[in-house]
Regions:
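Residue-level detector of alpha-helix initiation sites
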Residues: 109-110
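Rhodanese-like catalytic fold shared by cysteine-dependent sulfurtransferases
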Residues: 16-46, 73-100, 113-175
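Short, surface-exposed ligand- or partner-binding patches at beta-edge/loop junctions that are enriched
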Residues: 105
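Short hydrophobic beta-strand that contains or immediately precedes a catalytic carboxylate
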Residues: 53, 62-67, 80
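Positively charged n-region of N-terminal signal peptides that target proteins for export
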Residues: 1-4
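Bacterial N-terminal signal peptides
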Residues: 6-15
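A general structural motif
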Residues: 59-61, 99-101
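Alpha-helix-centered segments that form part of catalytic cores
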Residues: 44-51, 57
């Protein structure tokens, strides 16, 4: 009986440790938006902040956009490749090493977390979800490009309800 008690304690300790490692001390600039993001994420995959991604050399990480094609066409993070959510497009992964660093994003992080989980199940080991996703990226003033890779101030807000979290006044919301 004592062995089972020790085993149970070890399993619980491992679970708590691995869960807390995923909950990196990330915050969005706006407290209300940060709380909204936290409410939607399960923290089932590691997260990376927009500052960290912005500072990373562009060729060092594969950036994947898990939104829908019409959202991606309006704007996306420079260097990002469309992978989709409802219309999954795994072609972008062809030839990608399983240990290549990958960052997935969507509007706030919910859809990208689901796609990141899928990638991890496929064997990709260095997958992260962009905390606050493209909304936080834009809110902090980082660049966006359109479908022709030209700079833009337009951002697809998914719908009117979710667009309220695009807080940067220089961004033109589209839905």
């Amino acid at each position: 009986m004592r062995k089972w008690g020790i085993f149970f304690i070890l399993v619980m300790a491992i679970m708590c440790t691995s869960h807390s490692q995923n909950q990196v001390d990330m915050h969005c600039q706006d407290k209300a938006f940060d709380q909204e993001v936290r409410n939607w994420l399960q923290f089932s995959v590691p997260v990376i902040g927009v500052d960290q991604l912005h500072q990373a050399p562009q060729d060092s990480v594969l950036i994947l956009d898990a939104r829908e094609p019409e959202e991606y066409a309006v704007s996306h993070i420079p260097g990002a490749h469309y992978i989709g959510y409802n219309r999954w497009n795994s072609d972008v992964l062809r030839g990608t090493d399983l240990d290549r660093p990958i960052v997935v994003y969507c509007s706030i992080g919910y859809r990208s977390e689901k796609i990141a989980q899928k990638l991890m199940k496929m064997g990709y080991s260095q997958v992260k979800n962009l905390y606050g996703s493209i909304f936080e990226w834009a809110n902090q003033g980082f660049p966006l490009v359109d479908g022709e890779n030209k700079p833009t101030q337009n951002l697809h807000g998914f719908n009117e309800k979710w667009s309220k979290w695009i807080l940067n006044p220089s961004i033109h919301k589209i839905w």
